[in-house]
């Protein structure tokens, strides 16, 4: 039974009242047997469907899974989420997007999965794709020189942070340049990768991993990781959460593509937990310490060193006192 048929049956079952197999087959123009197979396939996917003789079928409970049609329902997007693909498992959503990009996929494609078998973090590190997380990447083909791409991680961090705040009410903050935190613990990481010619970007892939349903973490990361479920003491609906995140990312990325506005920069700074804290970093082999005081429009962190000199840091390892 095809996924499209299952989706169609599911949409008709959503009403919360009984609908007969006969009516379903009439509306969809398929046999009663095809309907029965689709119902059983949905049950295998975790949908609780009641069936009563002479009454038909009724959806009792949906499983908390990623559903592309639920995510895109009512979405009015321009640059992120113009096409959405959900996968049960994947090696890495960034790698999947790169493969699609080489097959000429259009800008705006989003790939989402609850399992990555070979997820990766910054500097090529292995990213622990714990069960309970949601991992997604999106494709952009901006007509920009490579030097203008650095601020894109800022726009993505801002979008995710705003969406988490709106969806959960949590006081999420941004740890420059690419993490979202709640109460000084990491809830989200962002990895931006780019393929470019000398003077023009071919495509950009932004990968985002969010801790959603985890109830605990391995001992070695428990002190620095948390999840939406731990923080809200409830279970967020994955598809509704992704709907909110994609809708918000579309706005912040669109704004970035037109040149990050002063308002967005102000908003980012107000939610950035790094500003005002003591930081240490390594530059040209030398360890430097100072205070993070600002973020530039290009997404650089401005640090006032102990000797009073101000430097702009564009990436690399910055350790922030008080945050993992």
Where do the language-model regions lie?
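A local structural micro-motif
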Residues: 50, 172-173
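Short loop/edge segments at beta-strand edges and connector loops
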Residues: 88, 174-176
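N-terminal lobe of the biotin/lipoate ligase/transferase fold
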Residues: 6-165, 188
């Amino acid at each position: 039974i095809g996924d499209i048929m299952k989706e169609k049956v599911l949409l008709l079952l959503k009403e919360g009242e009984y609908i007969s197999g006969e009516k379903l087959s009439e509306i969809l123009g398929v046999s009663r047997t095809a309907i029965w197979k689709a119902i059983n396939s949905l049950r295998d996917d975790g949908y609780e469907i009641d069936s009563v003789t002479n009454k038909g079928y009724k959806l009792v409970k949906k499983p908390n899974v990623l559903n592309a049609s639920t995510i895109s329902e009512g979405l009015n997007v321009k640059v992120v989420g113009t096409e959405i693909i959900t996968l049960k498992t994947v090696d890495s959503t960034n790698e999947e997007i790169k493969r699609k990009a080489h097959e000429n996929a259009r800008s705006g494609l989003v790939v989402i999965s609850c399992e990555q078998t070979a997820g990766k973090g910054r500097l090529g590190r292995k990213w622990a794709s714990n069960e309970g997380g949601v991992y997604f990447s999106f494709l952009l083909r901006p007509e920009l020189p490579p030097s203008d791409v650095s601020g894109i991680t800022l726009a993505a961090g801002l979008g995710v942070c705003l969406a988490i705040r709106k969806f959960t009410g949590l006081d999420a903050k941004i740890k420059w340049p690419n993490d979202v935190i709640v109460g000084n613990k990491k809830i989200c990481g962002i990895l931006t990768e780019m393929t470019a010619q000398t003077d023009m970007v071919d495509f950009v892939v932004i990968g985002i991993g969010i801790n959603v349903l985890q109830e605990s973490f391995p001992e070695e990361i428990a002190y620095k990781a948390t999840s939406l479920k731990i923080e809200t003491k409830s279970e967020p609906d994955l598809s509704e959460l992704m709907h909110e995140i994609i809708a918000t990312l579309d706005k912040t990325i669109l704004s970035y593509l037109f040149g990050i506005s002063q308002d967005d920069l102000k908003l980012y700074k107000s939610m950035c937990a790094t500003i005002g804290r003591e930081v240490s970093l390594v530059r040209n082999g030398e360890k430097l310490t100072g205070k993070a005081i600002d973020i530039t429009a290009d997404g650089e962190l401005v640090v006032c060193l102990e000797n009073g000199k101000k430097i702009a840091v564009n990436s690399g390892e910055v350790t922030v006192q008080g945050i993992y």
